[in-house]
Amino acid sequence: MATVGFDKKQFFFDRQIVIDAVGRAGAKNLSKAGSFIRRSARSSLRRRKKVAPPGEPPSVHSQDRVATLKNIWFVFDPGQRSVVIGPLKLNGSKLQGSNRATVPSLHELGGTAVAGGRRKRKRRAKYARRPFMGPAMERELPKFAGLWANSVK
């Protein structure tokens, strides 16, 4: 599996490259849409010790400010001229297993991965589907039409 790396900060909505690509009004509206979805996804993730039931957003157990599911970013995608929203990919966040998926994607889509490390016994862990990004977008979708209503003057 190939990984493409880039500096995501160059695609923040206040950068000139983004404003030139979609215009000031388009950048502002895409930024608001990304912000709405990010806020909705973050608020659906609860910090607690218990495991969330399948079908509900996952519980967040980490106290770290960086290595957590709540660290959600949104950036401009110049290829699609759209906004990309999701949890930050951390180094070492890929799990062993057949599809080598990341923890956020396992929560969103469900699946299996090999859990354990160098000194721990390795075992297959089955993740139930606990979506949080898809439902956040569905909740915020009705607001999007109003964003572009009077954007071109």
Range-by-range predicted roles:
Residues 113-153:
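Lipid-handling modules and contact-site tethers
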Residues 1-21:
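N-terminal, Lys/Arg- and Ser/Thr-rich interaction peptides
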Residues 10, 15, 40, 65, ...:
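Generic alpha-helical secondary structure signal
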Residues 15, 22-33, 37, 137, ...:
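N-terminal small/hydrophobic-rich alpha-helical segments that act as secretion/targeting modules
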Residues 11, 90-92, 142:
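Generic "edge-of-domain/loop-turn" microfeature
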Residues 20-123:
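Short, low-complexity, charged/polar segments at coil/turn and helix-coil boundaries
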